[in-house]
From Swiss-Prot:
Acts preferentially on penicillins. The class A beta-lactamase family has a specific amino-acid numbering system, sometimes called Ambler or ABL numbering and often misspelt as Amber. A multiple sequence alignment was used to derive a consensus sequence and then the consensus was numbered taking into account insertions and deletions. This allows use of identical numbers, e.g. for active site residues, despite differences in protein length. UniProt always uses natural numbering of residues, hence there appear to be differences in numbering between this entry and some papers. Its main location: secreted. One of its GO terms (molecular function) is beta-lactamase activity. Keywords: Antibiotic resistance, Hydrolase, Secreted, Signal. It catalyses: a beta-lactam + H2O = a substituted beta-amino acid. It comes from Bacillus cereus. Residues 1-43 form the signal peptide. It holds the Pfam family Beta-lactamase2. Belongs to the class-A beta-lactamase family. The active site is at residues 89, 185. One of its GO terms (biological process) is response to antibiotic. This is Beta-lactamase 1.
């Protein structure tokens, strides 16, 4: 009798084990199929966007670098993601992030004085306050919101210069960005010159770290994104390429050789934000940049991620 009970128990255990094995095998197989399907979908989307970005390059006679991250799904859209471009004034948003990283919010109330000799071309805010100075927070906001070049230089000085900026990014894992000069020389954008350059992928990752990652605490992230939401120079760029009910916070940049850039974090309704970096350049030094190129590239990104 005892042997019969043991036999029944053994049979039950065996059947249960077989069922679990079958379930695991089925579940594992299903997950593998699902993963392959998702990988295939992402690959298909990148192939489709690759063609569209290539067509934009031909249309505008320009070179594009694009990297976008859907922070909710980790889906990425990439085109020439590792090619170097002059970062131009996009650095101001990231340098402001470094400033916030290295200083308390109380430090933003400190008044910074400067002279007329410190002013450089395109300083619409700082040129009005030479006599009184500005708080560090006001200077950072002027750099990010109005792309004020003197404010950008003061930001650099407060974080150890261009090399201090580069060093801060290295600590965050960026092994790509090269920062060498102050405004306005950093906008020369000479083809083949790696000074003051980065890639769409590196910039997008840095922006993600500062705005939704762990590089800054919540309060400081909010300060940075509020400055970027008020950007006065981005209406015709990524902001123009996203649906009107999306919230956009961006920082633009421009330089010689038709350099036109925009980096942004955008919030679709009821979804996690999307990080977008779009960089562009042309072959001729005096070439005119195209805002429309950035707008249309942003539209390609949004259509692919929707």
């Amino acid at each position: 009798m005892k042997n019969k009970k043991m036999l029944k128990i053994g049979m039950c255990v065996g059947i249960l084990g077989l069922s679990i094995t079958s379930l695991v095998t089925f579940t594992g197989g299903a997950l593998q199929v699902e993963a392959k399907e998702k990988t295939g979908q992402v690959k298909h989307k990148n192939q489709a966007t690759h063609k569209e970005f290539s067509q934009l390059e031909k249309k505008f006679d320009a070179r594009l670098g694009v990297y976008a991250i859907d922070t909710g799904t980790n889906q990425t859209i990439a085109y020439r993601p590792n090619e170097r471009f002059a970062f131009a004034s996009t650095y101001k948003a990231l340098a402001a992030g470094v400033l916030l990283q290295q200083n308390s919010t109380k430090k933003l109330d400190e008044v910074i004085t400067y002279t007329k000799e410190d002013l450089v071309d395109y300083s619409p805010v700082t040129e009005k306050h030479v006599d009184t100075g500005m708080t560090l927070g006001e200077i950072a906001e002027a750099a990010v919101r109005y792309s004020d070049n003197t404010a950008g230089n003061i930001l650099f000085h407060k974080i150890g210069g261009p090399k201090g900026y580069e060093k801060a990014l290295r600590k965050m894992g960026d092994r790509v960005t090269m920062s060498d000069r102050f405004e306005t020389e950093l906008n020369e954008a000479i083809p083949g010159d790696i000074r003051d350059t980065s890639t769409a992928k590196a910039i997008a990752r840095n922006l993600k770290d500062f705005t939704v990652g762990n590089a800054l605490p919540h309060q400081k992230r909010n300060i940075l994104t509020e400055w970027m939401k008020g950007n006065a120079t981005g209406d015709k760029l990524i902001r123009a390429g996203v649906p009107t009910d999306w919230v956009d916070a961006d920082k633009s940049g421009a330089g010689s050789y038709g350099t036109r850039n925009d980096i942004a974090i955008v919030w679709p309704p009821n979804r996690s934000p999307i990080i977008i970096a779009i960089l562009s350049s042309k072959d001729e030094k005096e070439a005119t940049y195209d805002n429309q190129l950035i707008k249309e590239a942003a539209e390609v990104v949004i259509d692919a991620i929707k």
